[in-house]
Amino acid sequence: ILGTILGLLKSL
């Protein structure tokens, strides 16, 4: 889901 993508971006 989009939340997963946002989580990865926050990891950066």
Curated annotation (Swiss-Prot):
Tissues with expression: Expressed by the venom gland.
Protein name: Polybia-CP
Annotated effect of mutating residue 4 to A: Increase in antibacterial activity
UniProt keywords, alphabetically: Amidation, Antibiotic, Antimicrobial, Chemotaxis, Immunity, Innate immunity, Membrane, Pharmaceutical, Secreted, Target cell membrane, Target membrane
Family designation: Belongs to the MCD family. Protonectin subfamily.
GO biological process, alphabetically ordered: chemotaxis; defense response to Gram-negative bacterium; defense response to Gram-positive bacterium; innate immune response; positive regulation of chemotaxis
Subcellular location, record wording: Secreted; Target cell membrane
Origin: domain of life: Eukaryota
Temperature-dependence annotation: Is stable between 20 and 100 degrees Celsius.
Originating organism: Polybia paulista
Lineage of source species: Eukaryota, Metazoa, Ecdysozoa, Arthropoda, Hexapoda
Example of a GO cellular component annotation carried by this entry: other organism cell membrane
